[in-house]
Amino acid sequence: MSGHRNLKRRCGESHLESPAGCAHGPAAACVLSKLVQLPTPPLSKHQLKRLEEHKYQSAGRSLLEPLMQGYWEWLVGKVPAWIAPNLITIIGLLINIFTTLLLVYYCPTATEQAPPWAYIACACGLFIYQSLDTIDGKQARRTNSSTPLGELFDHGCDSLSTVFVVLGTCIAVQLGTNPDWMFFCCFAGTFMFYCAHWQTYVSGTLRFGIIDVTEVQIFIIIMHLLAVIGGPPFWQSLIPILNIQVKIFPALCTVAGTIFSCTNYFGVIFTGGVGKNGSTIAGTSVLSPFLHIGSVIALAAMIYKKSAVQLFEKHPCLYILTFGFVSAKITNKLVVAHMTKSEMHLHDTAFIGPALLFLDQYFNSFIDEYIVLWIALIFSLFDLLRYCVSVCNQIAAHLHIHVFRIKSSSTHSNHH
């Protein structure tokens, strides 16, 4: 979810396979490497220089963090010193994604009931991700392998995890029966994560509230366990006095959380940034990042409401994943803009997927919307992965480090 507080300047470690090594590797590996690499480096020399100078800054502490510190310290002590922090993060993310996809498989419309073990697996997957996402920073400091890449990698994984976590929660409470609520909850989650980094782009400091990521994740784990214990009858039962279904309660909590968080975020954003004349850390308008997330949500809402075949109602999981990948990419670009003190540009290949859906509807669904949704999903995922791999490779090459491996004799501290 929202870039874990225990990141603490953690940044990461290694080189994915780079195209430079193609001449010495198998032809298939060379083709694959080129396929997932952008044709031109995503970051300029000036951005890389400013990235080296970046310092991680955070403020605030959540309610459960002091209580969880003992467990996190114990857990990181069990991790071998040779395991890179980024490897810890990616393992947690993959587990989180896999367990959520189990629910997507059994509940494609978020109205079905999955086997009890699937909800338990999803709860465990989220807890594992939370634990590993927290200790990666501790592992980086413990092994003296903190670099700016790790901070970016951590936030990047969080941006993708957010999409799967909110989707898994909606499936657990069978919110697909209320598509408007499901749409709101999923996009509210990605919007709040984006806003957390938007205010960081403005102020230069990542702020945490008394109720933050850890608390929300524990609440979601409880939702999954309640799905095991109560099942559909529980979510469909009415809350006395309020006379609303129990499944609407988590949605109302999302509304309250969105209002509370956005009030804090926009309080920072509208107060003025640390740049010249109250601008962002990059000297740009404090409102400029809204164009990106605003475009994503506006396109998602228009396509949802204008679909003649009830595309979102019939395929909510595919729909949320498609726009979730788009949101994850623009969030990653916002984090990069913050860390490199550079401007965000609105034109981006991330919008191609949503644009295909929009144009298909404009021409009266010339192609089946379901087919176009799959095309948009695959393209958006590929576009996200291609950007992330390219950025990680470029930064790792620049800092002479590895993404998933700790160099035996390194001077990572030079890049703190």
UniProtKB/Swiss-Prot annotation:
The keyword Isomerase appears for this protein: no
Main location: endoplasmic reticulum
Keywords attached to this entry: Endoplasmic reticulum, Glycoprotein, Lipid biosynthesis, Lipid metabolism, Magnesium, Manganese, Membrane, Metal-binding, Nucleus, Phospholipid biosynthesis, Phospholipid metabolism, Transferase, Transmembrane, Transmembrane helix
Entry-linked Gene3D superfamilies: 1.20.120.1760
Catalytic residues as annotated in Swiss-Prot or TrEMBL: 155
GO function terms (MF aspect): 1-alkenyl-2-acylglycerol choline phosphotransferase activity; diacylglycerol cholinephosphotransferase activity; ethanolaminephosphotransferase activity; metal ion binding
Transmembrane segments: 89-108, 116-133, 156-176, 180-199, 210-230, 246-267, 286-306, 315-334, 349-363, 368-388
UniProt subcellular location: Endoplasmic reticulum membrane; Nucleus membrane
GO cellular component: endoplasmic reticulum membrane; Golgi apparatus; nuclear membrane
GO BP terms: phosphatidylethanolamine biosynthetic process
Residues at which Mg(2+) 1 binds: 133, 154
Binding-site residues, CDP-choline: 86, 151
Metabolic or biological pathway: Phospholipid metabolism; phosphatidylethanolamine biosynthesis; phosphatidylethanolamine from ethanolamine: step 3/3; Phospholipid metabolism; phosphatidylcholine biosynthesis; phosphatidylcholine from phosphocholine: step 2/2
Cofactor section: Mg(2+); Mn(2+)
Site (Increases basicity of active site His): 151
Catalytic activity: CDP-ethanolamine + a 1,2-diacyl-sn-glycerol = a 1,2-diacyl-sn-glycero-3-phosphoethanolamine + CMP + H(+); CDP-choline + a 1,2-diacyl-sn-glycerol = a 1,2-diacyl-sn-glycero-3-phosphocholine + CMP + H(+); 1-O-alkyl-2-acyl-sn-glycerol + CDP-choline = a 1-O-alkyl-2-acyl-sn-glycero-3-phosphocholine + CMP + H(+); a 1-O-(1Z-alkenyl)-2-acyl-sn-glycerol + CDP-choline = a 1-O-(1Z-alkenyl)-2-acyl-sn-glycero-3-phosphocholine + CMP + H(+)
Coiled-coil annotated spans: none
EC number of this enzyme: 2.7.8.1, 2.7.8.2, 2.7.8.22
Membrane topology, from the record: Multi-pass membrane protein
Function: Catalyzes both phosphatidylcholine and phosphatidylethanolamine biosynthesis from CDP-choline and CDP-ethanolamine, respectively. Involved in protein-dependent process of phospholipid transport to distribute phosphatidyl choline to the lumenal surface. Has a higher cholinephosphotransferase activity than ethanolaminephosphotransferase activity.
Subunit field text: Homodimer.
PANTHER family per record: CHOLINE_ETHANOLAMINEPHOSPHOTRANSFERASE 1, ETHANOLAMINEPHOSPHOTRANSFERASE
Protein name stated in the entry: Choline/ethanolaminephosphotransferase 1
Species assigned in the record: Gallus gallus
Gene name in the database record: CEPT1
